[in-house]
Regions:
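Periplasmic c-type cytochrome electron-transfer domains
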Residues: 1-209
Length: 209
């Protein structure tokens, strides 16, 4: 079944990269689909209809066979679309001190320390496959923006940070255009009190992932 909520109340999510999909376990706008195979079947059966059964009927149903077609599509996504190389990381997903810059090493210390990023983004892929509520309703009231009710989305999915520099924009709905924006967002939401140098070092570290 697709998302039958009125358009203005639906979640808007960024189109995520398919790289590293093999280590992810939450899919769909409501994160209710646990495997890429489930997501593939859902997209074929119920997506893109805007909750309108007439549109769904006009498109028709193209049901894929789970044991072969869905499986083969998943094989392509899971086996071929790996993360980009990260030559500065060791086998444990941490920086190799012989290859990293001073700024990157400082950023790594902040990532695992003061910024608390590793509470959700754990090496070696920097993901925990869970949902976390940042409680952003503390900062604004729901309001209509371009025909959509913008509000706090509650728990959001933890995305992997490997190759993060190559996949802007950021956050679940693409509201943060750069890594600098993202660091500042979490600095405010978590009340981290990072200074300009710490924020710069943290960005340098994430660019090395």
């Amino acid at each position: 079944m697709g998302d039958i909520r009125p358009q203005k109340f639906r979640h808007r999510i960024d189109t995520p990269p398919l790289r590293g999909v093999n280590i992810q376990r939450l899919f769909g706008s409501q994160r209710a689909l646990k495997t890429v195979e489930d997501f593939t079947e859902f997209e074929q059966r119920a997506a893109y209809f805007d909750g309108d059964p007439v549109i769904a009927t006009k498109k028709g149903v193209n049901i894929l066979e789970r044991g072969s077609q869905v499986h083969f599509m998943a094989e392509v996504q899971e086996e071929i679309m790996d993360f980009p190389p990260a030559p500065k990381l060791n086998i444990y997903g941490k920086l190799d001190p012989k290859k990293a810059t001073e700024a990157e090493l400082r950023g790594q210390e902040i990532f695992f320390g003061k910024a608390q990023c590793a509470a959700c983004h754990m090496p070696s892929y920097y993901i925990d496959n869970l949902m976390h509520n940042l409680k952003t309703e503390r900062f604004f009231k729901p309001q209509m923006v371009n025909g959509r009710m913008a509000s706090a989305d509650g728990p959001i999915k933890t995305f992997p940070l490997r190759g993060i520099k190559d996949s802007p924009p950021y956050l679940h709905d693409g509201r943060l255009l750069t890594l600098e924006d993202t660091v500042e967002f979490f600095n405010l939401v978590q009340d981290l009190k990072l200074n300009p140098q710490e924020k710069s070092d943290l960005v340098a570290y994430m660019r090395a992932l």
